[in-house]
Amino acid sequence: MSLKKLITEVAVVDSMFDVEQELMNIKESILEQVIVEGVDDPGILKCIFMAGGPGSGKSFTAMEIFGIDKRLKTSFSHTGLKTVNSDSAFEKGLKDNGIDGKKLAQIEKEDPELWDKIANNDDSIRNKAKAITQLQRKFYEVGRLGMIIDGTGHVYSKIQKNKKHAESLGYDTYMVFVNTSLEVAKERNQNRDRVLSDELLTKSWGDVQNNLGKFQNLFGGNFRIVDNTVYKPISGQVQKAVNNFVKKRVYNPIGKKWISTARALKNANIIKK
């Protein structure tokens, strides 16, 4: 099975809420092929974190920067980067349970039992979606495929931990911070498929803002801010910086060693192509 065919199959699987079982059925031999066939893929060993509060327009920004088709449930960009985002699985879970995402704020206030089922219980819809997405991410990591980690960034330690994990696998890391005013975020929230309460949105927005300086220190030169208060084309400066990062040779010594080993295996036909 070619890498292209495998990725296509995962795209189909990702549109299903039962993706966990599907991913667990992938054979080790196929994963080995991902390792050797993917070594020369675009975006290999590049990991870009998207951060920004609810309503900041991260999806719009990702679409603009990476050429991601917003109509796709699973996003595979022309850069070779694969989007890791639990929103699709979460929205599918809500739909399967007959829950209107636009009523989440109302449910949080009026139906604590249902809200626990959605967001708080160990087996909540949200936690199941996160678990599924984590499995998908692990699949990408096996082949060191390039990734866009799409999250809010309201918990600094989580980003810090995920960055360290990615770098331990050999990835070069980068962050695009999508910024907007609280007023605009609240306005956009009302037009989202999942409407959050003002209290939850305000807290998340504040947490993300408080982490801005920390993120700048954490990522150093591999950090760009996008002002998305008004939807507009991404600045050429940001676009160029991100493109250069993706296209540059892998800098991480662990990643360099992985590429050398995988390429040697591929050239020696140790694992059938």
Task: Name each model feature, range by range.
Residues G38-L45, F139-E141:
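Phosphate-binding P-loop
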Residues I65-G143, S157:
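Conserved substrate/cofactor phosphate-moiety recognition/catalytic segment
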Residues G53-P54:
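The conserved Walker
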Residues L182-K273:
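Conserved GTP-binding G-domain of TRAFAC-class P-loop NTPases and closely related GTPase folds
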Residues T61:
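Hydrophobic positions on the alpha1 helix immediately C-terminal to the Walker A/P-loop
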Residues K58:
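Conserved lysine of the Walker
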Residues H154, E167-E187:
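Conserved phosphate-donor/acceptor-positioning beta-strand/loop module used by diverse small-molecule
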Residues A11-V39:
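N-terminal pre-Walker A segment at the start of P-loop NTPase domains
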